């Protein structure tokens, strides 16, 4: 069993960290665990989680966020080298409206391929359709005022 703080009984990722739920482990250190996603968007899609439970991006302590992000970078490099990926997406979903389904902070490391046989992920928006400058500036003001 792996040690973890803040574990919840109903969190599948806490179970994976504790060793009570099976997974295909890729890498582990004192703070993080990386394992294969069971519903992959591409060949080699995996998840990186902090061992300490945090619900989402708004909840995670800065030290766990930094460690998880650095582990994801290391995994992304290995995916490109080891799997021959052409690129990688790093994804976090925070909250139900953002498609979060497991409420334990995690980063998806999704290797991307030019070969559609290895990659079923599609962007949920159309790039190349920028908003008007006034709308962008207004959103910047609203977010900045909330900092």
Model-based region annotation:
Residues 1-147:
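HIT superfamily nucleotide-processing domains
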């Amino acid at each position: 069993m792996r040690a973890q703080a803040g574990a919840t009984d109903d969190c599948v990722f806490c179970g994976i960290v504790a060793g009570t739920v099976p997974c295909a482990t890729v890498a582990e250190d004192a703070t993080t665990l990386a394992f294969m996603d069971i519903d992959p968007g591409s060949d080699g899609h995996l998840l990186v989680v902090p061992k300490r439970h945090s619900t989402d991006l708004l909840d995670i302590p800065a030290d766990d966020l930094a460690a998880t992000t650095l582990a994801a970078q290391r995994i992304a490099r290995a995916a490109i080298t080891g799997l021959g990926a052409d690129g990688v997406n790093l994804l976090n979903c925070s909250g139900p409206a953002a498609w979060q389904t497991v409420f334990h902070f995690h980063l998806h490391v999704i290797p991307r391929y030019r070969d559609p046989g290895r990659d079923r992920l599609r962007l949920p928006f159309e790039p190349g359709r920028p908003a008007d400058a006034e709308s962008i500036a207004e959103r910047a003001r609203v977010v900045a005022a909330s900092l």
